[in-house]
Regions:
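Short, compositionally biased P/S/T/A/G/V-rich stretches that sit at domain boundaries
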Residues: 3-69, 235-241
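Short beta-strand elements
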Residues: 7-28, 200-245
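Contiguous beta-strand segments within globular domains
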Residues: 64-80, 88-90
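Active-site acidic/histidine clusters and adjacent loop/turn architecture
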Residues: 274, 293, 299-420, 426
Length: 508
């Protein structure tokens, strides 16, 4: 039965008569409606849209994902038209079945208001064909709404209506319910469809092959032939590139995150209680989304900073082999602690147990902490630069999820290959031989041969809110801006105590 969009944004059935209108030579038509990512090329001059649906599969690591977008992500809704320049269109989004909410009523989602540059809850979204305000960059004092004038190919999109939105409700409780329902579905996805109609309720044709105008709404993304739009569950982080100007860095013009005091936040996150996977997305200086990695997340008992011991205490419940490939050898498991022995020998001038093989006790903190298993290597090209690292002589390849997001930001700002990490923490949150790495909130990196490169890397760690950067006192004494210098860091840079409060939590 034909439908229309009412004033509240709900879709309702039309009463007869609803006969077709005889078209003239200027058939007014909505040809296609689809969700998309923004794709910017030519050093920020050209903008295009990349469709995301079941007919245009998304990939991670060369493999198709079972979904087209993630619950909570920012996407664009693109409405392609013919002979409808400057006309206004209403659009609503609703579930294709009962999976997401238990019904198929129109969803209230977070619509991007170009004037305020904030996301606002909206059921019915109204947009004008040929208006590009959804593409605006971050506003300035002189121009609070931003601008899209830097795009030189907007004429290519003059017959499109463009909406920017986040695929989430305004309330955390509703988000959790939707996530639970998606997790319970056989496909672990929920399908969304779009209903569109002229705001003035005048006749319109729908679909690329339509030859008649009808006075009703059109439905898109509601069949396999059109493509389904499938939403899945993930925790995710969005990491925004900074713009280099000489030796300094400023916020990118497409970073819309809120301020943290006088500094704009550079990372946002959305935690999804129905997923144990965390996906990291980088946004370059033009606003392009770049997939970095998906990591498995666990929750383990947190550990206090390690304490050196002269011997392993009696009374261990059991012993276990430590992960091979690093200095740790044996874990001695106690009721409220893990004592690790290994091959690391203290310096002869160390204050505690000089020259001895190190024995470290990590007591339980009493609170679980989240950890992600980092990729063994990373090498992602971004505009002639790279986000890259490898590990060296360590199996400490687990990290606090927030800290890993910040590390990706550091690498994006540094922009060169050759960064080797000597580790974060193990999967049990201990960090042998380090005393100060439990819970994966610190990053160790080998010193780079090039002095300027090492200084740039250190500066990036400081810029990305690592509050305890420690450099050595011998060959590295020339490094500037470290928070502390210590002899036990003569062979590696320690970047720790990442400030998680610097991250924008979408539901806080």
């Amino acid at each position: 039965m034909p439908i229309t969009i009412d004033d509240t944004g709900q879709t309702v059935t039309l009463n007869p008569p609803y006969s077709p209108v005889t078209p003239d030579d200027s058939l007014q038509k909505i040809t296609r409606v689809y969700f998309a990512k923004k794709t910017v090329t030519q050093q920020g001059a050209n903008v295009a849209f990349t469709r995301i649906d079941s007919l245009h599969a998304q990939q991670e690591g060369g493999q198709n994902t079972p979904f087209d977008s993630v619950l909570g992500k920012t996407v664009y809704l693109v409405i392609e038209t013919e002979n409808m320049a400057t006309l206004s269109i209403d659009a609503v989004i609703r579930p294709s079945d009962n999976t997401l909410t238990g019904n198929t009523e129109t969803l209230s989602l977070m619509w991007f208001n170009p004037e305020t540059q904030n996301f606002e809850v909206r059921r019915k979204m109204t947009v004008v064909v040929g208006n590009f305000d959804a593409l605006n960059n971050k506003g300035t004092t002189e121009n609070p709404s931003g601008t899209h004038d830097h795009y030189t190919n907007l004429a290519d999109h003059e017959n499109k209506a463009i909406i920017k939105l986040q695929l989430r409700p305004s309330l955390r409780t509703d988000f959790n319910t939707w996530a639970t329902n998606i997790a319970a579905a056989a496909t672990h996805t929920a399908n969304l469809e779009v209903v569109v109609e002229r705001t003035d309720n005048e006749p319109c044709a729908y679909g690329p092959d339509s030859t008649e105008e009808v006075k009703e709404a059109g439905i898109f993304l509601n069949s396999d032939a059109q493509g389904r739009f499938r939403v899945g569950n993930r925790n995710f982080y969005e990491i925004y590139a900074r713009v280099q100007s000489g030796t300094t860095y400023t916020d990118g013009t497409y970073n819309f995150l809120p301020m943290n005091g006088t500094v704009r936040r550079k990372i946002s996150k959305l935690e999804n209680p129905s997923s144990t996977q965390v996906t990291y997305y980088h946004y370059d200086i033009y606003g392009n989304e770049i997939f970095i990695a998906t990591c498995n997340k666990t929750s383990v008992m947190g550990r206090n900073n390690g304490q050196q011991l002269g011997a392993v205490p009696q009374g261990a419940l059991r012993t276990e082999n430590a992960p091979a490939g690093g200095a740790a050898q044996t874990n001695h498991i106690f009721a409220n602690a893990i004592v690790t022995t290994g091959t690391h020998r203290n310096d002869r001038n160390a204050r505690a147990f000089p020259g001895a093989l190190r024995i470290v006790r990590y007591t339980a903190s009493g609170t679980n902490v989240p950890l992600v298993r980092m990729p063994d290597t990373l090498n992602v090209a971004v505009n002639g630069r790279v986000i890259a690292y490898g590990f060296s002589n360590t199996q400490r390849r687990f990290c606090n999820p927030d800290c890993f997001a910040a590390f990706v930001g550091v690498l994006s700002q540094y922009g060169l290959a050759g960064v080797n990490s000597t580790g974060m923490c193990f999967g049990d949150a201990t960090s042998y031989p380090s005393l100060a790495h439990p819970n994966g909130d610190s990053v160790d990196t080998s010193y780079l041969a090039n002095r300027q490169n090492e200084q740039n890397l250190l500066n990036a760690f400081v810029d990305w809110n690592f509050a305890q950067v420690i450099a050595g006192t011998t060959q590295q004494a020339w490094l500037r801006n470290a928070h502390r210098y210590a002899t036990d860091h003569n062979d590696h840079l320690h970047s720790g105590d990442f400030d998680g409060n610097s991250i924008h939590n979408i539901y806080q």
